[in-house]
């Protein structure tokens, strides 16, 4: 009757160093197979162990079981070892336990060497990361204070120059407005002079008219005088003719009334005419004086009104010019303030963009550093897990070696065979890793050899 032992499997994938220092990879798989033990008086016992898998970068390490319960009959132990992708099997027959132990020791030495190499690579990688971080610190925080001070000084000088330019522009505008004011005053005075000259010309025309009137009146007076002389001559002639006529009558008529005194009458007439002429002359002079005074009063009143209106116009023009000057100054100040505000906004926006860019770069660097730290932490945890698993395997192999050295394979055909005796003692408790549950061994089942010496 064929006898089969409990089955335990152990396999590991490719294990590659995270830092890339070692260019090769090792792939190991081992299998200890024995399916079950069938005894005449014992029920079959089967043990199973949890599987653990760990990923490291692009490499992987997978262990299906940490501590199998193994039966060692009088034959019945098989291993398989694969290196670099090739598979080969080695069957161990009865009496080849030393070779099996030697191969297991070689595998243990390889695992320990690999663990030591990975620890060295991890330490070198941590030192490289630390050196890189120390080298990157000055670059992450550059000192721009001197440049900022120079920029602030230049900005202050620029602002002072702009303020001085604005002040000079305002002064130039004020000078232009003052020149315009003086030009306006000059034009006003010229217009006043022209108005006075026109008034003088008008008065001269009036004076000429009055002179003409006076000459006309003088001509009339002369004509009246000539007429008076003519009348006097005519009167004398008439008087003489009348005298001649009356002389004869007087001679004839002695008792007649006394004759009229013609000289007296002529004197009276002369006095009357002279009085009339004098009155006319006086009236004409009075009328001329009255008209002249009225015209002078009108001219004076018009001149006063004109002067008051011109003064008011000048005052209004001065007020308008002052308001225009103030308006230009306010416009210039507003333009200067707007330009200063725009420059300040542009400067602060550029500084804000630079700071935002620096913050973004620092955040990106921090994110990269955190990602690297997390990756290194994961790799470190993976290495710790691998180390724990390797220690678990070492303990397993040590238990196997001790059990093989202390016990011999069971033979039921021997005279002193007893079914109650066990082939192997209980293995010590071992753990798969830091987080795996501990599995205690139970007494090993008794192996039954296969008929005909087969297992």
UniProtKB/Swiss-Prot annotation:
Residues 133-143 are annotated as: Linker 1. Residues 1-97 are annotated as: Head. Residues 144-244 are annotated as: Coil 1B. One of its GO terms (cellular component) is cytosol. It holds the Pfam family Filament. Residues 98-132 are annotated as: Coil 1A. GO terms for biological process: anatomical structure morphogenesis; epithelial cell differentiation; intermediate filament organization. Residues 97-408 form the IF rod domain. Early expression in the hair follicle, mainly found in supramatricial cells and lowermost cortical cells of the hair bulb. Residues 261-404 are annotated as: Coil 2. One of its GO terms (molecular function) is structural molecule activity. Gene3D superfamilies: 1.20.5.170, Single helix bin (1.20.5.500), Vasodilator-stimulated phosphoprotein (1.20.5.1160). Keywords: Coiled coil, Intermediate filament, Keratin. The record marks 346 as: Stutter. Belongs to the intermediate filament family. There are two types of hair/microfibrillar keratin, I (acidic) and II (neutral to basic). This is Keratin, type I cuticular Ha5. It comes from Homo sapiens. The lineage of its organism: Eukaryota, Metazoa, Chordata, Craniata, Vertebrata. The gene is KRT35.
